[in-house]
Amino acid sequence: MSSYKPLAIPTYPKLGEKITQDTLYWKRYKTPVQIKEFGAVTKIHFSPIQPFSYAVTSSTRIHLYGQYSQEPVKTFSRFKDTAYCGTYRGDGKLLAAGCEDSVVQLFDISGKAALRQFSGHSKAVHFVDFTSDKYRIVSGSDDYTSKLWDIPNGIEIASYKEHTDYIRCGCTSSLNNDLFATGSYDHTIKVFDGRTDKSVMSMDHGQPVESVLLFPSGGLLVSAGGRYVKVWDILKGGQLLVSLRNHHKTVTCLCLSSSGQRLLSGSLDRHVKVYSTMNYKVVHSFDYAASILSLALAPDDQMIVVGMTNGVLNIKHRKPEERKPLQSTTKRHPRYRVFVRGKDYMPKQDDIYVSKPVREHLKKYDQLLKGFHMSKALDAVLQSQIRTKKPEVTVAVMNELKRRGTLKNALAGRNEKELSDLLIFLLKHLVNPLFLPILLNVAEHIIDIYSPVVGQSSVIHKQFIRLQEVVEKEINYQEELLKILGMMDTLFATMTTKKESPWEEPKPILPLGSQ
């Protein structure tokens, strides 16, 4: 008598993601650390100098965190109302922030009290940034104005009122001391030169603008609003280069990698998309638990920090590169070669390989099938761990029972719990094309066996109704597909030119002038 052969579990093709260098790079960020803030995290900004601490603006506070700290190393809480846009200066020594009470405040990182308070706006200030010369501050407010402030004298230098709605974002140029851009809910982005009294350029984004970003080169500007991320060429007078629509909800924040080769965008759809700035295609994506309001990447690209609407701060550190240990150069004892002898031996083509017989350990369902316990074998693969994580094993056992002609007997005689587990599996996988042939047979047998007693259990009755709905929905779906297929055949038939059949008799060629 031949020995029992274990049940062969078929493998099905899986649609795996394409592994690229970007995928490997961005997946090297470790499991995130999460910190709960007092309110929604509206702004995250890294210090430009080491050790790259970062400011987190949330509710009425601005917290400063160290690179690896999970508690704030410093807190600025002297705001009368909600704080906005805590931003470091280029040297990392000063920090500016706006507030709901319309005042722009300037803080020294080593102190707590405000060094300067700039009053001039009449409504909340949502955007604050330093110019590249470090001596001026740009601000944008809900009063539709953007202002330029002088830090040493604490006075207003210039005021611009060209927007017709709230100004919620902006940025300054890292190359030009006088150039800055603002984005507004009036759908426009305006570029200003501090030496003039009006804007030098205007672009229409088409949606309320939530974030703007200037490339380090100063030639390109990125705007985010609605579901769109748009790239503009400033050197060509604000010409639109590309419009990206990869998010499902409003895009709220933007940031660049240190090299400028990757652009990151965060959205209310809980995704962070990473784009290549060469072709503006998505090269990677991060998923988060809540809608994203703010996003920042450390200057050395070793940290990604994301702020969400539920007040959670999500921090990911990049894993250090694995370094191969250097081979030891110490002299070894002569007997060492005895222990490592044959380590690098490669077998030749004509060598005879004698394998040691390995005793196969049968799975539980294989043991039951070997003992002809059909119903128990089916019970074994209907356990929650197998039917949810490895449905192909459950289907393989059903196929084996059908091959042996014992499928109907194995399905019969089940109590409410066992029948409920079987129906749950059917409801989940019945419309899967990979499992459809065998599961249709199982469903037919269940209906034949248990339809007379289905009303005795409310749970089973509800599952039978759901099974009917799933089948009806699939039938309607198939009918719609057949209709679409028929329409496509009609379109293709009208587009195809009639070709002469090879067996059709050729028409005679008449001489000129003949009828």
Swiss-Prot record:
Name the Gene Ontology biological process terms: positive regulation of transcription by RNA polymerase I; ribosomal small subunit biogenesis; rRNA processing
Primary site of residence: nucleus
Q: Which SMART domains match?
A: WD40
Q: Which UniProt keywords apply?
A: Nucleus, Repeat, rRNA processing, WD repeat
Query: What's one GO-annotated cellular component?
Result: nucleolus
| UniProt entry tagged with the keyword Ribosomal protein | no
- Write the protein's name: U3 small nucleolar RNA-associated protein 15 homolog
Quaternary state and interactors: Part of the small subunit (SSU) processome, composed of more than 70 proteins and the RNA chaperone small nucleolar RNA (snoRNA) U3. May be a component of the proposed t-UTP subcomplex of the ribosomal small subunit (SSU) processome.
Q: What is this protein's function?
A: Ribosome biogenesis factor. Involved in nucleolar processing of pre-18S ribosomal RNA. Required for optimal pre-ribosomal RNA transcription by RNA polymerase I. Part of the small subunit (SSU) processome, first precursor of the small eukaryotic ribosomal subunit. During the assembly of the SSU processome in the nucleolus, many ribosome biogenesis factors, an RNA chaperone and ribosomal proteins associate with the nascent pre-rRNA and work in concert to generate RNA folding, modifications, rearrangements and cleavage as well as targeted degradation of pre-ribosomal RNA by the RNA exosome.
Q: Which InterPro entries match?
A: U3_snoRNA-assocProt_15_C, WD40/YVTN_repeat-like_dom_sf, WD40_repeat_CS, WD40_repeat_dom_sf, WD40_rpt
Q: Where in the cell is it found?
A: Nucleus, Nucleolus
Q: Which Pfam families does this UniProt record tie to the protein?
A: UTP15_C (PF09384), WD40 (PF00400)
